[in-house]
Amino acid sequence: MARLKDYYQKKLVAKLKTELGLDNIMEVPAIKKITLNMGVGDAAKDKKIMTFALNDLTAIAGQKPVVTKSKKSIAGFKIRDGWPIGAKVTLRGDRMYEFLDRLITIAIPRIRDFRGLSAKSFDGRGNYSLGMREQISFPEIDYDKVDSIRGLDISITTTAKNDDQGRALLKAFGFPFKS
């Protein structure tokens, strides 16, 4: 069992139940899934770029990503309908908790000029999104083999009913929010 999953079930559920004033432990917010997305606009020009992006995302997530394709042709961006323009992966279960553990303990502290996560990135329903400018913050990425610095979007979907419950859940997991 993943370390954070065990920690959530044994300690956080009881703590959050009293902190949020909930009656039933089934009301306690939990993390449903984590979605990682990497947009690769340059893939239209060079197919190798997409391969490098897929390899990076596979190393970070621990599972194979799905290639996202453009929905329609846009002349201004020089892309055609159906061309690969990115990759995404959805993590659930133990892999999700293991990724969350690596994100909180290793990747976020390695971000340059980091001053805390913005508390404004909640969507109104308790879900949180953050963007990372460099994929090299993750220890799985070998710095010498990186062809270019690429960012990625991380969306954390929770069962929280509002932003306050979502913030309390992520803060209990150890997310370093700005004060």
UniProtKB/Swiss-Prot annotation:
Highest taxon listed in the record's lineage: Bacteria
InterPro entries: Ribosomal_uL5, Ribosomal_uL5_bac-type, Ribosomal_uL5_C, Ribosomal_uL5_CS, Ribosomal_uL5_dom_sf, Ribosomal_uL5_N
Organism the protein comes from: Francisella tularensis subsp. mediasiatica (strain FSC147)
Record Gene3D superfamilies: 3.30.1440.10
Keyword match Ribonucleoprotein: yes
Pfam families: Ribosomal_L5, Ribosomal_L5_C
Family membership noted in the UniProt record: Belongs to the universal ribosomal protein uL5 family.
Name of the protein described by the UniProt record: Large ribosomal subunit protein uL5
Subunit structure: Part of the 50S ribosomal subunit; part of the 5S rRNA/L5/L18/L25 subcomplex. Contacts the 5S rRNA and the P site tRNA. Forms a bridge to the 30S subunit in the 70S ribosome.
Function: This is one of the proteins that bind and probably mediate the attachment of the 5S RNA into the large ribosomal subunit, where it forms part of the central protuberance. In the 70S ribosome it contacts protein S13 of the 30S subunit (bridge B1b), connecting the 2 subunits; this bridge is implicated in subunit movement. Contacts the P site tRNA; the 5S rRNA and some of its associated proteins might help stabilize positioning of ribosome-bound tRNAs.
GO biological process: translation
GO molecular function, one term: tRNA binding
GO CC annotations on file: ribonucleoprotein complex; ribosome
PANTHER family in the record: 60S RIBOSOMAL PROTEIN L11-RELATED
